[in-house]
């Protein structure tokens, strides 16, 4: 049946039994396809019936469907004609793991940062009103987890202030708060599902208020009693008191019930909350039985067991997790903060070991940062573990609430640099540029697991400024020993005997391994290279300018945007120190990268050992540092 669905129109003629059969097909399709490619399995298994109902009730793309975060949009993609592309999910030039405007007119928003959908919906509804398209509904699907983000409530405050047709579907999978319970609450929900309820209620208001003398008093008394009952028995009051209609709670796996609720909500032609209770991982036992995350995201897995087909090598996140626990055992002042991601950021183990020193603040990065400031003011040392890309959300708080007060808060920036398959919104390629303008900020970029542990300890010893440690996604690799350490900077390689000090190659973090490969390739061409790892990359170590003065060319290699990156900072440091040595930088261009593997993205932008070797050879030849002809040497490097 799924093969016959080319678009939402193909759903309209299906019976309830056919829809039930289709839902089963969709789940099996998802399980087998995502098992082969990796992706967000649990969230999509939980929204099958909901997505079917949305596309039967609303006219996409005429009525925009906006999925908050977007990782639960796989079913939406299937119902809008993209089922045949799922073998390429999250692969280079393939199907994105999130909504994508370049893929389909049905995808309005492609940023996968949480808590933003309601603001998009508010803006679209205003635009439709101003341009005369009053017959268009805007639908935002937001999870209960995303509602922990303050931006949602800012948007709700605005949406509730006008009678624009915005339908907000709260996909409540029970992960953040319990569904409404109790007979009277069920009665209220049933009343709200009756087509004539709102009309009858309005007529009742008019009749009571029309009573001579006592009408308004009676109405206020009745309203207060009703409000008091709601406050006591139902969480819907948080929405209705804002002036929003409320429909629910609805069994999110009963397609007919969800569809009925959505049709009634559509008929209000005003802002309305539809509360849908779903189960993450629905229909796949390994996901339903995964108590920690219900298979929120997975790699390639065995369908029968739900287990990964390959044993993962030690990763950066686990290395950080182990180190933090060790430091936490020695120091009771260390506390940990996450913004709704204890597992992915490596804090689950710290939470289990030191539950009283762990704080999950929900999807609230701004609050996390300022709360950390308060903890530091109180004599503790907070460690805020966050994805690099989400740091952007809390920049003002970092600058004004933490750095201005010179507070000892340590940021641990996971998924820095190119992350790959999750696409543009998840690449952490701006953190060095952002952090570089924060006064007093100190940033470390460990090259391996041993340095991660060491630099974390050094950060925790800082008591008068914020610090940050950045590392990428993936395997941590083998430790890379230093030849020597000079005033805090590790020397990883020096020119071989007989070669001059031609190039100082400054490697940022894990790019140290690539830098050593480049140095070896250049050695074979008679070019002497010193490879250094600054360890603490911001501010630029003063000794680095002394290293530079002894060489003919400085080259920086970093997993960050070139604008405002370490290369820019090193160039500025050389100018300020009046060291007249040319500096070239290798890094990421200022653009949004499509989803692909990390290696594929880096290759596309020329950040490979082969290409860097070729570039340096040309730069050295242009300086006259060696007699070799640049083109001739480049050919030999190939």
From Swiss-Prot:
<dbReference type="GO" id="GO:0000287">
    <property type="term" value="F:magnesium ion binding"/>
</dbReference>
<comment type="subunit">
    <text>Homodimer.</text>
</comment>
<feature type="binding site">
    <location>
        <position position="173"/>
    </location>
    <ligand>
        <name>Mg(2+)</name>
    </ligand>
</feature>
<comment type="function">
    <text>Catalyzes the acyloin condensation reaction between C atoms 2 and 3 of pyruvate and glyceraldehyde 3-phosphate to yield 1-deoxy-D-xylulose-5-phosphate (DXP).</text>
</comment>
<dbReference type="InterPro" id="IPR005477">
    <property type="entry name" value="Dxylulose-5-P_synthase"/>
</dbReference>
<dbReference type="Pfam" id="PF02779">
    <property type="entry name" value="Transket_pyr"/>
</dbReference>
<feature type="binding site">
    <location>
        <begin position="145"/>
        <end position="146"/>
    </location>
    <ligand>
        <name>thiamine diphosphate</name>
    </ligand>
</feature>
<feature type="binding site">
    <location>
        <position position="365"/>
    </location>
    <ligand>
        <name>thiamine diphosphate</name>
    </ligand>
</feature>
<keyword id="KW-0808">Transferase</keyword>
<comment type="similarity">
    <text>Belongs to the transketolase family. DXPS subfamily.</text>
</comment>
<feature type="binding site">
    <location>
        <position position="284"/>
    </location>
    <ligand>
        <name>thiamine diphosphate</name>
    </ligand>
</feature>
<dbReference type="InterPro" id="IPR033248">
    <property type="entry name" value="Transketolase_C"/>
</dbReference>
<dbReference type="InterPro" id="IPR020826">
    <property type="entry name" value="Transketolase_BS"/>
</dbReference>
<dbReference type="GO" id="GO:0005829">
    <property type="term" value="C:cytosol"/>
</dbReference>
<keyword id="KW-0460">Magnesium</keyword>
<dbReference type="GO" id="GO:0030976">
    <property type="term" value="F:thiamine pyrophosphate binding"/>
</dbReference>
<dbReference type="GO" id="GO:0019288">
    <property type="term" value="P:isopentenyl diphosphate biosynthetic process, methylerythritol 4-phosphate pathway"/>
</dbReference>
<dbReference type="InterPro" id="IPR009014">
    <property type="entry name" value="Transketo_C/PFOR_II"/>
</dbReference>
<dbReference type="GO" id="GO:0008661">
    <property type="term" value="F:1-deoxy-D-xylulose-5-phosphate synthase activity"/>
</dbReference>
<dbReference type="Pfam" id="PF13292">
    <property type="entry name" value="DXP_synthase_N"/>
</dbReference>
<feature type="binding site">
    <location>
        <position position="71"/>
    </location>
    <ligand>
        <name>thiamine diphosphate</name>
    </ligand>
</feature>
<dbReference type="InterPro" id="IPR049557">
    <property type="entry name" value="Transketolase_CS"/>
</dbReference>
<dbReference type="Pfam" id="PF02780">
    <property type="entry name" value="Transketolase_C"/>
</dbReference>
<feature type="binding site">
    <location>
        <begin position="112"/>
        <end position="114"/>
    </location>
    <ligand>
        <name>thiamine diphosphate</name>
    </ligand>
</feature>
<keyword id="KW-0784">Thiamine biosynthesis</keyword>
<keyword id="KW-0479">Metal-binding</keyword>
<comment type="pathway">
    <text>Metabolic intermediate biosynthesis; 1-deoxy-D-xylulose 5-phosphate biosynthesis; 1-deoxy-D-xylulose 5-phosphate from D-glyceraldehyde 3-phosphate and pyruvate: step 1/1.</text>
</comment>
<feature type="binding site">
    <location>
        <position position="173"/>
    </location>
    <ligand>
        <name>thiamine diphosphate</name>
    </ligand>
</feature>
<feature type="binding site">
    <location>
        <position position="144"/>
    </location>
    <ligand>
        <name>Mg(2+)</name>
    </ligand>
</feature>
<keyword id="KW-0786">Thiamine pyrophosphate</keyword>
<dbReference type="GO" id="GO:0009228">
    <property type="term" value="P:thiamine biosynthetic process"/>
</dbReference>
<keyword id="KW-0414">Isoprene biosynthesis</keyword>
<protein>
    <recommendedName>
        <fullName>1-deoxy-D-xylulose-5-phosphate synthase</fullName>
        <ecNumber>2.2.1.7</ecNumber>
    </recommendedName>
</protein>
<dbReference type="InterPro" id="IPR029061">
    <property type="entry name" value="THDP-binding"/>
</dbReference>
<dbReference type="GO" id="GO:0016114">
    <property type="term" value="P:terpenoid biosynthetic process"/>
</dbReference>
<dbReference type="InterPro" id="IPR005475">
    <property type="entry name" value="Transketolase-like_Pyr-bd"/>
</dbReference>
<dbReference type="GO" id="GO:0052865">
    <property type="term" value="P:1-deoxy-D-xylulose 5-phosphate biosynthetic process"/>
</dbReference>
């Amino acid at each position: 049946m799924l093969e016959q669905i080319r678009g939402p129109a193909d759903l309209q003629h299906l019976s309830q039994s056919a829809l039930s059969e289709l839902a089963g097909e969709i789940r099996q399709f998802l399980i087998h396809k995502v098992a082969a490619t990796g992706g967000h399995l649990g969230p999509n298994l939980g929204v099958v019936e909901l997505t079917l109902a949305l596309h039967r009730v609303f006219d996409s793309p005429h009525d925009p469907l906006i999925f908050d975060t977007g990782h639960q949009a796989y079913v939406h993609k299937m119902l809008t004609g993209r089922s045949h592309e799922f073998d390429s999910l999250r692969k280079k030039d393939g199907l994105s793991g999130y909504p994508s405007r370049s893929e389909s007119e049905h995808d309005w928003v492609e940023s996968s940062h949480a808590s933003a959908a309601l603001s998009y919906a508010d803006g679209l509804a205003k635009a439709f009103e101003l341009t005369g398209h009053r017959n268009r509904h805007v639908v935002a699907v937001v999870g209960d987890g995303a509602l922990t983000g303050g931006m949602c409530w800012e948007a709700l405050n605005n949406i509730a202030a006008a009678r624009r047709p915005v339908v907000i579907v709260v996909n409540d999978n029970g992960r953040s708060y319990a569904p409404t319970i109790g007979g009277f609450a069920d009665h209220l929900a049933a009343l709200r599902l009756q087509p004539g309820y709102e009309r009858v209620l309005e007529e009742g208001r008019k009749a009571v208020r029309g009573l001579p003398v006592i009408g308004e008093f009676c109405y206020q008394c009745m309203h207060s009693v009703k409000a008091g009952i709601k406050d006591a028995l139902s969480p819907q009051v948080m929405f209705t008191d804002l002036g929003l209609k409320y429909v629910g709670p609805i069994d999110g796996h009963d397609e007919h019930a969800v569809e009925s609720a959505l049709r009634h909500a559509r008929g209000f032609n005003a802002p309305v909350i539809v509360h849908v209770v779903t189960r993450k991982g629905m229909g796949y036992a390994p996901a339903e039985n995964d108590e920690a995350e219900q298979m929120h995201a997975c790699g390639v897995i065995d369908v029968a067991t739900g287990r990964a087909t390959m044993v993962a090598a030690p990763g950066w996140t686990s290395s950080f997790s182990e180190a933090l626990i060790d430091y936490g055992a020695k120091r009771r002042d260390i506390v940990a903060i996450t913004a709704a991601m204890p597992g992915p950021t490596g804090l689950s183990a710290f939470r289990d070991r030191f539950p009283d020193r762990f704080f999950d603040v929900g999807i609230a990065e701004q609050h996390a940062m300022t709360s950390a400031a308060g903890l530091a003011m109180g004599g503790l040392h907070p460690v805020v573990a966050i994805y690099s890309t989400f740091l952007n959300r809390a920049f003002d708080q970092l600058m004004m609430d933490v750095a201005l007060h010179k507070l000892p808060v340590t940021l641990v920036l996971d998924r820095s640099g190119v992350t790959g398959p999750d696409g543009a919104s998840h690449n952490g390629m701006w953190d060095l540029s952002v952090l570089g303008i924060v006064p007093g900020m100190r940033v470390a970029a460990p090259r391996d697991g041993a340095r991660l542990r060491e630099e974390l300890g050094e950060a925790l010893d800082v008591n008068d400024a914020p610090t940050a440690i950045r590392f990428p996604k993936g395997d941590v690799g083998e430790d890379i020993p230093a030849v020597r350490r000079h005033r805090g900077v590790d020397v990883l390689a020096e020119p071989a005997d007989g070669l001059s000090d031609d190039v100082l190659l400054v490697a940022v973090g894990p790019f140290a391994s690539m830098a050593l490969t480049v140095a070896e390739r250049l050695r074979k061409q008679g070019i002497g290279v010193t490879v250094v790892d600054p360890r603490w990359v911001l501010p630029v170590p003063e000794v680095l300018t002394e290293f530079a003065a002894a060489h003919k060319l400085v080259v920086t290699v970093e997993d960050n945007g070139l604008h405002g990156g370490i290369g820019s900072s090193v160039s500025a440091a050389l100018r300020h120190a009046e060291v007249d040595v040319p500096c070239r930088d290798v890094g990421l261009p200022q653009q949004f990268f499509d989803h692909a593997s990390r290696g594929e993205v880096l290759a596309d932008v020329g950040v490979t050992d082969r290409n860097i070797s070729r570039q340096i050879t040309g730069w050295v030849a242009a300086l006259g540092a060696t007699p070799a002809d640049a083109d001739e040497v480049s050919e030999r490097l190939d």
